[in-house]
Amino acid sequence: MTKLVAIVGATGLQGSSVLKSLHATGKYKLRALSRNPDGNQAASLKAKYSGVEWVPANLDDTASLRKAFQGANTVFGVTQFFQKDIMERVEHGDVDAEYNQGKNIVDAAIAAGVDSIVLSSIDSMKQLSHGKYPGVLHFEGKHKVEEYLTSLSDKVKGYFVYLGFYMENFVDFSRISPEDNKTIEFTVPLKPTTKLPLVDTANDTGPVVAYVLEHPEECLGTVVEVSGGYYEAQDMAKAFTEVTGKPSRYVQIPYDSIGSDELGQMFKGQDEFGYYGGRTEFIERNKEIKHTFTTPTSFWKNRG
């Protein structure tokens, strides 16, 4: 019998990548969840991927999630810290805002009789830094959901994918140099030689989730990192110039210059303790995934 996969956040970067990859396999029935399944983003995806069922769901409404998960064998779950309603709740003291949405996904999936959940999670920076940087809320919330799901392993199978450092961030970090009005500066609060497991979210997430679903026994209860390997932060600037021919440079800026203690702690932790805590085992294992992971060079080439 063809298995049904319900995809949370199907119009987002991660969810749409999962939708694309699973649809390409032709092996699954797909149900796409969105707060607005009749919106423009959903319409664009509907035009690309036929045969997908679209349903409304709100991560704050467990009843809507239970309904959306009915009959599904697997749920792909993802939460988003950097959205207006979550940020506002955090500003008003609700530091568990993202965790609560993730918990709702888990609880609703169990109530609907779902067999397994593939959860987009990440390491706890508090744990990686041995308590030095406890305030990276968009890491802590996701990891807390992972711990909650793990504690319920007798009720639902848990699989975990950890995305690397978003290459898309470097687009946001870029500016035209005020010195010559020509050079592209990548202003980042990281040491230029800090090694990052880079990922193109839209291109690399889906193939990894597809791999997890194809290898359920091997991946059960484990972490599968979503990246092809480590690169120095400054490599993104070097690759930009190589691909475009435009002058660029990497500029390390102070941690406190970004106006966010939460992000400042994240960058400090990555400089000191490494993204993924410096783990490298995934590089060899990910060669088994039939996917060419994005590199700094291919990222800029793909952006035209």
Predicted regions: what they are:
Residues 250-251:
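Double-stranded beta-helix
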Residues 57:
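Cofactor-binding loops of NAD(P)H-dependent oxidoreductases
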Residues 219, 244, 254-304:
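A hydrophobic C-terminal alpha-helical subdomain
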Residues 2-47, 60-63, 68-70, 77-99, ...:
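Oxidoreductase cofactor-interface core, primarily capturing Rossmann-like NAD(P)-dependent enzymes
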